[in-house]
Amino acid sequence: MFAKLESLERKYEDLERQLSAPDVVSDQERFRKLSKTHSDLSDVVAAFREYKKIAQDLEDNQEMAQDPDPEIRELAQAETKALKEAQVELEARLKVLLLPKDPMDEKNILLEIRAGTGGDEAALFAGDLFRMYTRYAETKRWKVEIMSQSETGSGGFKEVIASISGDKVYSRLKYESGAHRVQRVPATESQGRIHTSAVTVAIMPEAEEVDVAIDPNELRIDVYRSSGPGGQSVNTTDSAVRVTHIPSGLVVICQDEKSQHKNKAKALKVLRSRLLQVEQDKQRAEQEAARRSQVGTGDRSERIRTYNFPQGRVTDHRINLTLYRLDAVLEGDLDELCGALIGHYQAEALKAQADAA
């Protein structure tokens, strides 16, 4: 591990020299790429330099520990204990920083929320989840843009698709995909019985044209008049667009914009991300099948999280984490949940790395 860290530090220092060279500064594209690599290495290099400083301080403390003055020896022992604890924490952090990076982590995302079982109550909860993610995005200064929505008369969503753009959006939200279950008493329930409903969430890295090439000959594009809740027409022109990707059968409908051109652009953006997700899911399924053949399966991904309103709790079933602050979570306070999930999957990756060694 330390040989790799030394190599990364040398690379970091070389990048610093290159970034100050006039020929690099004058080449914007090259400067941008080198700056990105330099930025990517900054955390691990800073942690490694701190680790080396602690190692040097420990070495210096050995001399103090031999001092004839008992007070100085006692002080050295206390400092050594604190330094060793910091060294252990830093070593663990360095192992995480050296894990292979998910190439999608830097990407923006498409968020898809669909009401599942539970009728109107599921649609209302789909709206609650969309507001939750929107508020979380606001705290991170991310930009949210609705791509497509299908509202219900009760104020919920049958489906809503939005793009979220900003700093490392996918890395924070990628573990939100799955079935979210809600348990609460509907406003229309006269007996006070708790109903259980489900909503599915999909987090897809936003694909760019370089990620997924779409052959125009493989698309069928239909245009028609937009319609709102209940089927009423909201537009007198054929501005709604339905794009069908013939080889995969994927269909995307966009009708939120008054312009047919804008709806088509949004639909293609969603389609591109869905095709990228299909390819990623295929690769993950192949990897998971290989893993299951060796270690068996314990799949609990169907229901990833439960939101229980009577108890005011949120439980993430993948990591057995329960928080008794449902209101704060639904207001967009997701950092503890997201952080715990990221930590869990980093630990899983470290274990897999150790098992393979």
UniProtKB/Swiss-Prot annotation:
<dbReference type="InterPro" id="IPR000352">
    <property type="entry name" value="Pep_chain_release_fac_I"/>
</dbReference>
<feature type="modified residue" description="N5-methylglutamine">
    <location>
        <position position="232"/>
    </location>
</feature>
<keyword id="KW-0963">Cytoplasm</keyword>
<feature type="region of interest" description="Disordered">
    <location>
        <begin position="282"/>
        <end position="302"/>
    </location>
</feature>
<keyword id="KW-0488">Methylation</keyword>
<dbReference type="GO" id="GO:0016149">
    <property type="term" value="F:translation release factor activity, codon specific"/>
</dbReference>
<protein>
    <recommendedName>
        <fullName>Peptide chain release factor 1</fullName>
    </recommendedName>
</protein>
<dbReference type="Pfam" id="PF03462">
    <property type="entry name" value="PCRF"/>
</dbReference>
<dbReference type="GO" id="GO:0005737">
    <property type="term" value="C:cytoplasm"/>
</dbReference>
<feature type="compositionally biased region" description="Basic and acidic residues">
    <location>
        <begin position="282"/>
        <end position="291"/>
    </location>
</feature>
<dbReference type="Pfam" id="PF00472">
    <property type="entry name" value="RF-1"/>
</dbReference>
<dbReference type="InterPro" id="IPR045853">
    <property type="entry name" value="Pep_chain_release_fac_I_sf"/>
</dbReference>
<dbReference type="InterPro" id="IPR004373">
    <property type="entry name" value="RF-1"/>
</dbReference>
<dbReference type="InterPro" id="IPR005139">
    <property type="entry name" value="PCRF"/>
</dbReference>
<keyword id="KW-0648">Protein biosynthesis</keyword>
<comment type="function">
    <text>Peptide chain release factor 1 directs the termination of translation in response to the peptide chain termination codons UAG and UAA.</text>
</comment>
<comment type="similarity">
    <text>Belongs to the prokaryotic/mitochondrial release factor family.</text>
</comment>
<dbReference type="InterPro" id="IPR050057">
    <property type="entry name" value="Prokaryotic/Mito_RF"/>
</dbReference>
